Swiss-Prot record:
Cellular component GO terms, alphabetical: mitochondrion; nucleus
Subcellular location: Mitochondrion
Gene symbol of the encoding locus: OXR1
InterPro entries: TLDc_dom
Protein name in UniProt: Oxidation resistance protein 1
Length: 326
């Protein structure tokens, strides 16, 4: 067959056109060039020192002997967990709380929430509210009168807002206790709130901590002892005046009872009462509509102890409601 005869034959898909062999040769040349360039770069950089990040990675994750076997993988030797170092980044310290809302003429005895107890409650609230350093007084029995309806009315402005609320109660014996509420108190036909809620109490005790032999096996609460403040001295005290007779110092023990998860009876409010936690026929904290009588018993929602030293039923002489995060 002559050369002209070969040109007249129909082209097949395998031999069609003359551009394919040329493009294939160019691609092959480019691939070889890139391969040699990469090898040259790799061999030229082998003599460089490893970075600190590479060294740290090798120290933490590579446990190989001279033969390349992993000696700490649990098979060829005793397993060793990865060595981790603490991050140097630390959150800034929280600013001290500032309590707003007490009137100028309110006596100190009528101020139920102290700064020390408020700081303890602060450690238990959600992180988004823990950084808030301003708490505002919504309702005070001393300043606004004994009425649950007034308390509800003052809370309506916070509807739909992601704020936190601290309920403070003082009984006839001077005990201070209460609850943290994830929603504002309002009359409702069903329970509301979530697992962020908790009950708490603060009681005066002697400065001595509990003995080391105390049984803490079934302890289901947070317990903190707050030292009493140092006695203040007057700068202009007359030299002839006699010092007051010393009185035994007192400390405050703070206990919190977080959500147990046994039920969802966190908050229940009606026009006739306000309650926090229930189950087993008992309320964790219950107040009547006149804010005169209260009940507190162990409940399933928080697994708490009775909050008042008077017993399961107590008389009320003070109520406050604080808000944060607005």
């Amino acid at each position: 067959m002559s050369f002209s005869d070969r040109n007249d034959s129909p082209e097949t898909p395998e031999s069609s056109g003359t551009g394919t062999p040329v493009n294939s040769n160019r691609a092959s040349a480019s691939y070889i060039t890139n391969m040699w360039t990469g090898l040259i770069r790799r061999f030229s950089s082998e003599g460089s020192f490893p970075s600190q990040a590479d060294t740290a990675y090798d120290d933490n994750f590579n446990y190989h002997d001279g033969n390349g076997h992993n000696t700490k993988d649990g098979i060829n030797g005793v397993f060793s967990p990865v060595r981790r170092t603490a991050s140097p980044m630390r959150p800034p310290p929280l600013d001290p709380l500032i309590l707003h809302g007490y009137r100028q003429g309110t006596p100190s005895s009528a101020k139920l929430l102290s700064a020390a107890v408020a700081e303890e409650i602060r450690t238990m609230v959600p992180e988004r509210l823990r950084i808030v350093d301003d708490w505002n007084l919504i309702y005070s029995l001393e300043q606004d009168g004994a009425s649950l309806a007034t308390l509800y009315q003052r809370c309506r402005q916070f509807e739909g807002k992601r704020a936190g609320f601290v309920l403070v109660v003082k009984d006839l014996e001077g005990g201070v206790f209460g609850a943290y509420l994830s929603e504002y108190p309002h009359p409702a036909h069903t329970y509301f709130g979530n697992g962020e809620c908790f009950l708490w109490r603060a009681s005066n005790i002697t400065p001595l901590p509990p003995p080391p032999s105390a049984d803490t096996t079934n302890l289901n609460s947070r317990n903190t002892t707050l030292a009493p403040p140092p006695p203040s001295s007057e700068a202009n005290t007359p030299t002839h005046s006699r010092p007051a007779s010393p009185t035994p110092s007192e400390a405050v023990r703070f206990k919190a009872f977080p959500y147990s998860g046994l039920n969802d009876f966190c908050i229940n409010c009606e026009t006739g009462f306000l309650s926090v936690g229930s189950g087993g026929g008992h309320y964790g904290l219950w107040l009547d509509n006149g804010l005169e009588v209260g009940h507190s018993s162990r409940c399933e929602t928080y697994g708490n102890e009775p909050l008042s030293d008077e017993g399961t039923k107590f008389g009320v002489i003070g109520v406050e409601l604080w808000v944060m995060g607005v």
